[in-house]
Amino acid sequence: MTAADEKQLMQQLSDPATQRKAFERVVREYGEQLYWQVRRIVLSHDDANDVMQNVMLKAWTHLDDFHQDSRISTWLYRIAVNESLDFMRRKKNQIVVSTDDGELGVANTLMADNYFDGDETQAQLQEAIAQLPDVQRMVFNLRYYDDMKYSEISQLLHTSEGALKASYHIAVKKISDFFKRHD
């Protein structure tokens, strides 16, 4: 989306007469990107859909809180990240599994998921990513899958670029170690 388009969209979102139509455009424009960001965090298609409903509901109900000093996509990504992390925290509190069961669970769940179109290596990568701490997982996903610049991630996660680079490199090392152990 160009800067001019974004500015126009922000104006439409601010105007009660055009707000609904503008928000529908936001959903069309960013919905798929947000879905895949959420899906990489929560892994399950059904869980991702549930989180996405919360993301869109929160975005709609908090339109007045949107400060136009950042891009719409950055604001939406932040909501998606927070909702995904909240979901994962709630899920962790509900289900306690051993590490061995958890390792089997993610790969098997992904391979059984009709919406997962990856191969066994992709399932193992997701398994390795799932074992990362929340922040490292988030940084890795944003950098690796979304190809975001450190400066964009810094703005999104409200942290320094140096800390992000360290988190990313530690995550890559942990993923590499995971593959060495499971070779």
Describe every region a protein language model picked out:
Residues M1-Q33, R40, R181:
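N-terminal module of bacterial RNA polymerase sigma factors
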Residues D65-H67, R78-S98, G118, I170:
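Arg/Lys-rich amphipathic alpha helix in sigma70-family domain 2
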Residues D15, L43, N54-R71, K91-K92:
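Sigma70-family region 2
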Residues T74, L85, Q136, S151, ...:
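DNA-recognition helix of helix-turn-helix
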Residues V139-R143:
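A short pre-motif secondary-structure segment
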Residues W36, D50-L57, S70-N82:
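Structural recognition of an alpha-helix C-terminal capping motif at a helix-to-coil junction
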Residues L9-D15, Q124-L132:
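Short amphipathic alpha-helical boundary/capping segments
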Residues T2-Q8, Q94-G118:
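Internal acidic/polar
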